[in-house]
Amino acid sequence: MTILGTALTPKATKVMLLGSGELGKEVVIELQRLGVEVIAVDRYENAPAQQVAHRSYTISMLDGNALKALIEKEKPDYIVPEVEAIATSTLVELEQAGFNVVPTAKATQLTMNREGIRRLAAEKLKLPTSNYQFVDNFDDFQSAVENLGIPCVIKPIMSSSGHGQSILKSKDDLQKAWDYAQQGGRAGAGRVIVEGFVKFDYEITLLTVRHAEGTSFLAPIGHRQEKGDYRESWQPQAMSVQALAKAQHIAEKITTELGGRGIFGVEMFVCGDEVIFNEVSPRPHDTGMVTLISQELSEFALHARAILGLPIPEINLISPAASKAIVVEGKSNQVQFGNLFEVLQEPNTNIRLFGKGEVNGHRRLGVILARDISVDKALEKVSRAYDKLDIQL
């Protein structure tokens, strides 16, 4: 039997969020709807989830001593990592001491870098993946490109939202691709994965929930990327019966190996009836923001339920839907959004503005959401709304 305490009382159920971006913000809101006390942590002040949490702290989460001291001070019932750049060895140590890491410290440690999860998927679980090599220096990088061929995909082993990722299309860009990967790593310069290019019809995120009563799958989400960063997503993505069955098999196999409870974003490439594993995140996925409007329970609500041991009897899709990321480039600490009346004029259209106070280069500041009678109609609707938005830096 699950018993939840009330926030800000001696018997409160406490969750500490490690990473406080826009996805974490939605998780905080869903936890607070269930009366949970939430502490949000990030490396910079006033991050989106910190703005809505009961308390917040700003530390380097790669500093194991600082992280351990904070967790021992707050003594949360659940520790919920929301980013990759965390001292995961400290989480392993704290889990062994009795703290509850969501979904598990092992899952957080393996998925924080692409090497751990790729070796688990391809070498231990024998899941279909692209060809790949890991490299530590420019000479080995050149050799890997020679072996895998051009085009190929270059990624830091630890990064998110497309940072440091590129598709190498010419040998003339070798140095540029290497330098970009070195600059984009969440923990600084270092090891890189070079992946053989996969020919695919489309990419999907299969959100997979491990909960008290088993494993459940959301309707597959299609998405479009630019420079490794999500720009649009839609649900459901049409798939053959065979491809969907293979995708669910892959997702169940990898999430079972990682263990614990919570939502996982399993990314895959699909070509006809064939499915190739790409990556997995043990947390809500940015492409899954479409579920804020497409489903009765969003990925964030499902994550909260799973963490707390609450039932998930079924997952209902309300209608086809789409999302479009609001991405800006420039420099400002006083961003404003205009024409919102026009943006929200059409029925079943919504917007989420993340509350990120500063732009210095390229940053995702919000998302536009819409439902319609088909995915194509929903994509057209979010594009129309996006075109009306006036962003002032």
Curated annotation (Swiss-Prot):
Mg(2+) binds at E267, E279. Transmembrane segments: none annotated. It comes from the Bacteria. The keyword RNA-binding does not apply. One of its GO terms (biological process) is 'de novo' IMP biosynthetic process. Pfam families: ATP-grasp (PF02222), PurT_C (PF21244), RS_preATP-grasp-like (PF22660). Pathway: Purine metabolism; IMP biosynthesis via de novo pathway; N(2)-formyl-N(1)-(5-phospho-D-ribosyl)glycinamide from N(1)-(5-phospho-D-ribosyl)glycinamide (formate route): step 1/1. Keywords: ATP-binding, Ligase, Magnesium, Metal-binding, Nucleotide-binding, Purine biosynthesis. It catalyses: N(1)-(5-phospho-beta-D-ribosyl)glycinamide + formate + ATP = N(2)-formyl-N(1)-(5-phospho-beta-D-ribosyl)glycinamide + ADP + phosphate + H(+). Its EC number is 6.3.1.21. It is an enzyme of class 6 (ligase). Involved in the de novo purine biosynthesis. Catalyzes the transfer of formate to 5-phospho-ribosyl-glycinamide (GAR), producing 5-phospho-ribosyl-N-formylglycinamide (FGAR). Formate is provided by PurU via hydrolysis of 10-formyl-tetrahydrofolate. This is Formate-dependent phosphoribosylglycinamide formyltransferase. The gene is purT.
